[in-house]
Amino acid sequence: MSNALAKKDIYLDLSIDDDGFDFATSIDDALAQAEAELVVLNETVESIKELKPQCDKLDYILAASSGALCGVIDIFLVGKPGESPIGDITDKWFANRTMDFAKLCHPDKKEFDSLDSALRFLEKEFKVPYDQTGLGDAGRAVFGMNAKNHHFKSLAHNPSLLGLFFSILDQFSNTSHFISDGQLISLQQADDKWELQGGNIPSKLFCGFVNWFGHLMSDVSGSNSSAKAGNRGMGIPSPLWTWTNDIIAIKAKLGLSVTDTDKAMNELALEIFEKGYDTRFQTAQAIPVFLNELLVRLIYAVRRLYRYFTETPKVERSFKLMWKKCEPFSNPTVKRMLTVAHGTFCLVDAGDAVGRALVSGGGTFNVVEFVLRLNVVGVGRFAISLYGETKRAISYGHAKSCLLYTSPSPRD
């Protein structure tokens, strides 16, 4: 037999009795079993191919370059609140969306020519009982509360599920819940004139949700007085930092003690909010991260598209094959490139944040300056990439073990 052919012995069970002999296993059964094993083996090999990235040196260089470029954009065009060219753009975008929302809610679909008039209309249209500012109203009972921080301290002003929960609770019970100095504070009978619209529970829930969302829209670009004065105003807290309020509120409701770490993180989040780190600035931070994502996927698709047209004969070309070779979404190669790109982005951004924190602190580390400049969106996206890499590495090891287990071993 030719040496080029791999052979495997097939053993058939043979039974012998007085009348003769018989095979317990037919050749057809053995072949069927072998074919089934081959299918499993091919599927395992295919799984390994789908889990292993096929990046070349240029892929890594281009991915790292994209991350470095977007990191530089983040340093000079995003920076920190109050010194952000991209932040000015996102501020204006939110202001325009606020005016669009006010027009949508107006009975006559009135065009608002200024932000302060739109905010004035929305503040009047979406009244809530938890809008104390600490300026002469019930909010003065909350220590340290003022017009600059009440959007953060007020749980119902948080754009999160817990914020929605406390908004509904406050509207039903005419209360206000705040976080101050690591404590959950509840104000009873917060507004003597308050009455939630709706004739039954479902309609009240709907009205409560609409009030919550509408009131957030009236606050996302600051107050009408700040807009009238030409100031940026205090927006609503970043969804990525309201968790510091959530932890304290949940622990208070469960009767658990609030740790010093919880208080320190909450105070840090409050301090950066007072310096302008709100939803608008968080959106500005997302732009270079999104650009990095877009560039890497585009680079991958263009390189594979060029390779497809240069290596695939015309008679074999098809849209289905081209998409399989070039799609920049589900394959491990582009995911590895994204990990490199976002890792490089975070390295550049964090290096700048650390340097500026040391400079502003006069040699000591200024934590607030560091957090203001650290792109949390980029860190979160990099963490997602690392999670995916870890998951694929575990799956790859498992698939490789299965391949070794199912592969036929040569017999003597």
Regions found by a protein language model. Give the residues of each.
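Glycine-rich, hydrophobic membrane-spanning regions of integral membrane proteins that mediate transport
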Residues: 1-407, 411
